[in-house]
Structures are given as structure tokens and as C-alpha cells.
């Protein structure tokens, strides 16, 4: 700056005014270009992507609520799917504003309907044009929103107790197909209905980019005091060539372990007949799992069906000898009705 004014015949006051004017213009320029780099509506790219399709729904019969999502994006369930028993579920996607999840649940828990809760959140969000979100509350109120700047094909459909929404789809057939699948599979449990919706979306093209991750959450109709009991189902596939096939498999495994848990409770209550029934159901759903076969055999043993149990033990022990080591630890815990010596005799026969 000194070189600029070195040979000019101007006063110090004039030099000051010139420098001040340049600084003023620079400040104004910075103010004008700042919005281009801020996190407001004009720059959605600072938010995480989750261009995807999803469903939020309530089962009118059981009161369960669910949110399911699939996307060609890593770990889509991390930000998109939210739920709380006795309150509601939320899906927040497109250029994701993750605060919609916890804030939406908080508003619904305070007594505000899903529709009005979503309205409040979008009204104060400067990036609303790039958002897509949906909510269902415990009373069956449904809210859905698709910003005008969401990437096509984009939109949503609100039905009784549910909403399906999508953006960046291959075509405009995805949302109608999702809606149809949900309505036509009302006889299924809610989680299985969600999987049918996933499959329907893919059958007509799905996400224009393909598939990568999926998530499925189911919460109950009653609030729970224990946070670990809040989600009845909480499944995620973070990175897979076929996330829908994988989440379908995981749901089947989950159902098997539901029966395993019931069998464990029955053993605690010394109800061996019920334990046998529950372990048997678990094994039928997941026959290749040694854990389920082993505990079914334990239940048979405790019910006096030793020969039937022995056949299962022989298969399990052949596949993994450590299970035989485990069974010898059970008498001390009172889990089986045989002593170590009796086990020795039993297995030597």
C-alpha cells in the first residue's frame, strides 16, 4: 500500500480515506459472499446426503410404530431413522437435517401431533427446500414434507397411519409401488410389511444410484422406563451389495432370537415345556445355528426326552466340540437336571 501512494502528491487525510474506502468495500464483499459458504438454505451441501426412500408407519392393531429406509449411501440408518416407544417415529432425509429426529420426537412427546411437529421444524429451517422428512405419532397423526429443491424423482404419499417418501428415484413409480405394498400386506407383522415395501420400491427401479445400506426400527405403543427396552427391533445394514436381502435375513434371525429369549425366561421360571416350545420355534427359523439347536436339546433333556436330545447333541458337538465342554458347566448353575457324573454316563451310552 505504501508503494501505491509513495510518489502521489496527496495529503495523509486523503490517503486514509482511500484506504478506509477499500477496506469498507472488502467488508461489504465478504458479507455478500458469506451466504454461499454458510449452512443456510442456499448451501445444502454442508449437510450429509441421504437421497433415499423410506416409510414411517403405525400398526393400527398392535400400536407398534416403525421406520424403514434404504439408500445408496453408507450407513443410512445413522442419521435418517429415529423412534421412541409410546411417542413416534421419524425419517429425515435428502440433504439431512439430523436434528429433525430428536427434536421431532421431543415435540411429539410433549403432545404436539406429528403433522404440527414437522411443520414447526420446517418453518424455522433455512434449508427447508432441500429437506425431506416424515413422522408418525402414537395417535396415528402423520406428517410428511418434500422440499421443492429435492432431487427428482421426489415426493411423498400420506395414507392412514403411514407415509412413504422418496427422492432421487429412477422414476415416478417408486412411491405408488411402496404405497401399494404396504396396503396389500396388512396381515403381516409391521416389520415384515416394511421389508415388503423395500422390495416393492426396488422392483420398479428404486434409487437411481443403486443400493448400499438399509435400516429398520420398530418401537412399541407403551413408553418404557428402560432405554435398552425402547426399540423392539433395531436393525441396520451399513454397507452391502444387497442391503434389502440382508436386512430381511437379519429380521428372520431377530424373530428366532425372540423365541430364544422366551425360552431362556421359561428356564428361569422352571417351565421346561414352554422352553422346549420356544427353543423349537427358534431352531425352525434358524436351523443352521448351533446355539439354537443346543438349547433345544437342553430343553429336551430337562423334559426327559434324552434320546431325542442326544441326536441333536451329537450333531452340534461334531460341528463344534466346545459345546460339549459347555454342557458340563451347566449342572453347577442348575440349568440342567443332571449331574456331571450322570452326563458322563449319558454321553458314553
Task: Cite the ranges covered by each PLM segment.
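Alpha/propeptide regions of enzymes that mature by internal proteolysis
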Residues: 41-209, 216, 238-269, 280, ...
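Start-of-helix register in tetratricopeptide repeats
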Residues: 257, 291, 325-326
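Terminal, low-structured helical/coil segments at or just beyond the last alpha-helical repeat
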Residues: 318-349
Amino acid at each position: 500500500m505504501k508503494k501505491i501512494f509513495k510518489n502521489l502528491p496527496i495529503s495523509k487525510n486523503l490517503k486514509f480515506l482511500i484506504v478506509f474506502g477499500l477496506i469498507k468495500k472488502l467488508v461489504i464483499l465478504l458479507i455478500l459472499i458469506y451466504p454461499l459458504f454458510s449452512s443456510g438454505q442456499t448451501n445444502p451441501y454442508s449437510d450429509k446426503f441421504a437421497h433415499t426412500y423410506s416409510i414411517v408407519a403405525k400398526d393400527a392393531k398392535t400400536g407398534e410404530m416403525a421406520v424403514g429406509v434404504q439408500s445408496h449411501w453408507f450407513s443410512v440408518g445413522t442419521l435418517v431413522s429415529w423412534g421412541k416407544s409410546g411417542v413416534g417415529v421419524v425419517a429425515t432425509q435428502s440433504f439431512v437435517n439430523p436434528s429433525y429426529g430428536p427434536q421431532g420426537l421431543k415435540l411429539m412427546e410433549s403432545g404436539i401431533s406429528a403433522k404440527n411437529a414437522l411443520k414447526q421444524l420446517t418453518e424455522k429451517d433455512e434449508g427447508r427446500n432441500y429437506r425431506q422428512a416424515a413422522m408418525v405419532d402414537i395417535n396415528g397423526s402423520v406428517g410428511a414434507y418434500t422440499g421443492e429443491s429435492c432431487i427428482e424423482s421426489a415426493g411423498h404419499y400420506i395414507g392412514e397411519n403411514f407415509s412413504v417418501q422418496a427422492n432421487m428415484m429412477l422414476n415416478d413409480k417408486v412411491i405408488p409401488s411402496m404405497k401399494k405394498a404396504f396396503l396389500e400386506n396388512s396381515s403381516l407383522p409391521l416389520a415384515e410389511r416394511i421389508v415388503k415395501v423395500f422390495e416393492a420400491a426396488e422392483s420398479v427401479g428404486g434409487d437411481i444410484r443403486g443400493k448400499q445400506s438399509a435400516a429398520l426400527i420398530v418401537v412399541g405403543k407403551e413408553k418404557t422406563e428402560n432405554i435398552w427396552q425402547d426399540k423392539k427391533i433395531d436393525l441396520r445394514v451399513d454397507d452391502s451389495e444387497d442391503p434389502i436381502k440382508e436386512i430381511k435375513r437379519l429380521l428372520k434371525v431377530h424373530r428366532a432370537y425372540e423365541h430364544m429369549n422366551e425360552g431362556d425366561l421359561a428356564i428361569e421360571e422352571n417351565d421346561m415345556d414352554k422352553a422346549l416350545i420356544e427353543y423349537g420355534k427358534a431352531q425352525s427359523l434358524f436351523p443352521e445355528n448351533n446355539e439354537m439347536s443346543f438349547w433345544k436339546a437342553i430343553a429336551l433333556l430337562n423334559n426327559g426326552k434324552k434320546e431325542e436330545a442326544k441326536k441333536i447333541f451329537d450333531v452340534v458337538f461334531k460341528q463344534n466340540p466346545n459345546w460339549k465342554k459347555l454342557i458340563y458347566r451347566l449342572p453347577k448353575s442348575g440349568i440342567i437336571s443332571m449331574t456331571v457324573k450322570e452326563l458322563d454316563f449319558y454321553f458314553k451310552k
